[in-house]
Amino acid sequence: MLTEDHIMLRESMSGFLSQLKTIKSLREMLSSGVSMQADTWKSLSEMGWTGLLIDEEFGGSNLGLVSACLMAENIGRSLLLSPIISSALLSSFAINLLGTHNQKNHWLSSIASGKTILTSSFGN
């Protein structure tokens, strides 16, 4: 069951994402070779989405997996052209779970601020 905070977060995310590009303009961007919307990434970082799963010690908000699922759901619904799932969710989760304190300090603060974009690999 979602808490009141989760519901507010979901509504905030949905509202922001509904203001972004339409499917037609996303298709045009993809066909032109654009792989990411830099202005959107900056906005996501400023709103704290890039630090959703990152501890406050490293500049994140540590809102937990339910909040991360709500973000993923909204991003999927909006077809957002962004590396936020691979960087802010998958990579930061792995580093937070398995990284040393030095690795966390180096990578997580940079991910939370939006300065570093990581990706995840699931095979070779």
Task: Show where each model-derived region lies.
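Intrinsic disorder at enzyme termini
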Residues: 1-5
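Conserved alpha-helical interface elements of two-component signaling phosphotransfer modules
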Residues: 8
